[in-house]
């Protein structure tokens, strides 16, 4: 009996500020085959075609490798996907979301593989995009940093336009509220309960704008046991100790982001800030881990949230070996606010033009009684 063919699936992209929308696309792609190979573009390529990335290429390579559905990462993948690339990495076809990715010249980056019949589509996750997240962070300039050069009215309106739903915005990167469902969470969850003899490790935090610091911390925590449970604080708790407009992402967005990565076995949604005996007993926790690079504030009553596990002798501090923080990412955006405003605005203009062209093509195909997803888009680059 002949061996069953291993289907190798190719995905590629910038994967900047990796979020659960990226992960959901990769999850769907993995379901179409046996092995998922992900190509990640360089900083130079992204800057040329879209504007500067928030995360550098080494950070992006590392983050994509951490996603649970990814088998291999190809560093420095070309911006336009070619048949040659698919053949080079022994991939049968490539998968992309049902939005359009364009070069700096306004050409569909998947044109060649579409013509070759080696292109498949999956559903894009509505309600989240890197453009949207950048827009949310830009809005923090009004209250979070209290800059002396407060945004004037025109600048404020321009900034808000990057994070507000509007008919004039791209349907792919405009803000539409993410609507969580139990089905979505189940698709992301590991679905395996701990075995009777598993050493169960517990960590907790906000995990806002999930980044390389979070990933490094979870990887170190996972090494201490067999099953890692991650408690994720509610929006109210995060806002209580961080203030202003935090968290950037809602509780359910943060839950899906954490569940996307390999170290996570289970999450506690809306975990208590202080780790209680009840929590430890309920989840049969053997070790409670705290990272030593991020400050944890005491409760309102000035109580150490790790007091109970310390008394029980199950508390263990670990070094995440990475200094990145959510605030550091916000600072990257705010310190280069003008650059990212321009990048977001240009990206939306290009996508609006592409969307209109795609709709026109679909209407023409319907009028001729045909359908399909292998249309090739080419538009003029909007200035």
What is the predicted role of each segment?
Residues 1-383:
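Nucleotidyltransferase catalytic core that binds NTPs
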